[in-house]
Amino acid sequence: MTGYDLVVAARRVVAGGAIAPARVGVRDGVIRAVVPWEHELLGTETVTLPDEAVLLPGLVDTHVHVNEPGRTEWEGFATATAAAAAGGVTTVVDMPLNSVPPTVDPAALEVKREAAAGQVYVDVGFWGGAVPGNTGRLRALHAAGVVGVKCFLLDSGVPEFPPLDPAQLRAALTELSTVDGLLIAHCEDAAAIGPAPPGRDYRGFLASRPPQAETRAVAGLIAAASETGVRVHVVHVSAAEVLPLLRAAVADGVRITAETCPHYLTLAAEDVPAGATQFKCCPPVRDAVNRDALWAGLADGTLSCVVSDHSPCTPELKRFDTGDFAAAWGGISSLQLSLPVVWTAAVARGRSLVDIALWMAQRPAELVGLRSKGSIAPGFDADLVAFAPDQEFTVDPHALRHRNPVSPYAGRTLRGVVRDTWLRGERVGDAPRGRLLRRGD
């Protein structure tokens, strides 16, 4: 067939749960054909990847804190989406907090969309927020196109986004049940968390946020979801003790899924140097035995996807001057590095790029109902990544595209380099041409 705007040919294409030689035909920004290598497709432009490169679907990162408007010294739409594109991420979904105003009603969503317009290099969707007092606005947020709503079950760290108590959580879920909405939750129980001792020793901070903080909060979420029938999702699982609770809930018919993040799959508490607050996040990075259990949970499907939880701040807020884990902001910036970070660890564990595409593209897109994202298949957006899985590089934070050069991966040698990124059939370049998405796009 003729008439394709773009044909991308590769000896290794990740599509349909397999890796095979193929040609991908694109017209009007949409994949129209995926055919075996020996079949010719004629296009206005034809790109043949070198043998060392693999064609992946563009990744979908559903856990990104862009922080604009209001805290653009931390991050912003231009820098975050440029970092995403450089890392093979073609769709991000922005979290409702750390921006001012937080995205807790349709008016705030419109403010955020206006802030993003014209400066995004990849496609961007939005989460709404559930906070005390906005239950009556959740259906309007849903109608305005958010992919779901997020709540905290303990203090979020910013005063404009307070947590829900158990009664407020049930009220929010009851409201969402009328539109079959999705609620995602930061699951830590404040009653199980002690004050972090001041100082440079990571072990003190880790001990202040034990696994029980996660398990208690997840148990409460499961109970509320079971009562209301609403679909819920646990963000950034760090404690392996959560996994049996998730398995039991799914067996009982609760509509629950969960994610983990690159740092929980690749870092270990025993390796965190004294005062290295770039490793601080909440919930915390735990030990290597726990890390192995998270990989097992990912392999058996208990954890459905891997997303970055890109949560940047200024270097000053990381308190590098003192290295005080108690005082430093908790958050890890890894949007540009998620793919090579996870791939480096995954290949060492015998996993394949089929797994990467499932965990980091297909399932995140399915989670948030972005039906045209996450797969190389006819009818999907032509969001494509040329990835050299065997090429290595050393992380230089100053070479990354996000705003502040802070990374726990500084100096690490990682495997896998993004050679090229296409958004809806066009190479991502110097001009921002991303779209602002609504649920269902």
Where are these regions (language model features)?
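Active-site loop-to-helix "anion-binding N-cap" substructures in soluble metabolic enzymes
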Residues: P69, M95-Y121, F126-T135, A140, ...
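Divalent metal-coordination and catalytic microenvironments
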Residues: R11, V24, G29, E52, ...
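His/Asp/Glu-enriched, well-ordered alpha-helical/loop segment
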Residues: R203-S208, Q212-R231, S304-V306, P312-D390
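C-terminal cap of metal-dependent C-N hydrolases
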Residues: R11, F320, D324, P378-G440
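Histidine/acidic residue-rich metal-binding segments in metalloenzymes
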Residues: G136-C151, G157-V306
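Metal-associated gating/positioning segment near the N- to mid-region
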Residues: A53-Q119
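Alpha-helix-loop-beta-strand connector modules within alpha/beta enzyme cores
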Residues: P106-V122, L169-A185, L337
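Histidine-rich, glycine-flanked metal-binding segment
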Residues: M1-P57
